[in-house]
């Protein structure tokens, strides 16, 4: 392998993960830190790495960069043609039925900025959470959803046209990270569920939403959704009529953090603040 590539990869890894981690035989870092490393390598070395690439060692990273350097860098448009083109139509189609069926109550919508980017971070109790959040928001919401919902060409096209993009849970999904960054950098609202899965009670939050806010400077808007678990509990296919409330909390604005190690460290503290804010909204 070219010595220059090895040196540059090692320098980037040391900057992002710290000298001790970068110099060890294995890159002992979580999926978010490895995603941070991948994006830093792309930015500084001018390459596009494979979305499904996994770095277990520094040699893995060097091999990935060496292979990527022989390929043209991908398009800056990571969202594809037609992304979100049916959002207003979906909002209009869902609005009246959801408000009627679930007596939808919306509180604190003034917390959502009238323009510019923001990350809406909500608890996740039910499959109804996404449509209820989309209807409650005063602006269109782009959102990431589990890849299983995109099975089949028709479902994939429909979700894409409504502003959804898939995320593979349980590991590093660079395509989802890139899409999320692109949405926020375009000044849009991004909906995220930091618990990572549906649960009857509020679970620990993953740091992705906080990291995204720190990476872009976008504010975090905590959201508490109550009633959807009763309307459509996990495992149910037929929703029941009941009341649903969507509460938007005051914005959490951690500011932009340009230093990768500091960003990773701060993301954990901001995540705790975010979870506490959502918990308070659910108790109201």
Locate each region found by the language model.
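Phosphopantetheine-dependent thiolation modules in NRPS/PKS and related acyl-activating systems
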Residues: 1-82
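Short, flexible loop segments at the rims of nucleotide/cofactor-binding pockets, characterized by
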Residues: 61, 96-101, 120-121, 166-171, ...
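Short glycine/serine/threonine/alanine-rich loop segments
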Residues: 19, 47, 139, 164, ...
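Short hydrophobic helices that act as membrane-entry/anchoring signals
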Residues: 84-103, 156, 160-163
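Helix-to-loop junction immediately C-terminal to a conserved catalytic motif
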Residues: 94-124
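Catalytic core of membrane glycerolipid acyltransferases/transacylases, capturing the structured
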Residues: 114-171, 179
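Non-catalytic C-terminal accessory region of glycerolipid acyltransferases
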Residues: 86, 175-284
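Short, hinge-like loop/turn segments at secondary-structure boundaries
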Residues: 68-69, 124, 160-162, 237-241
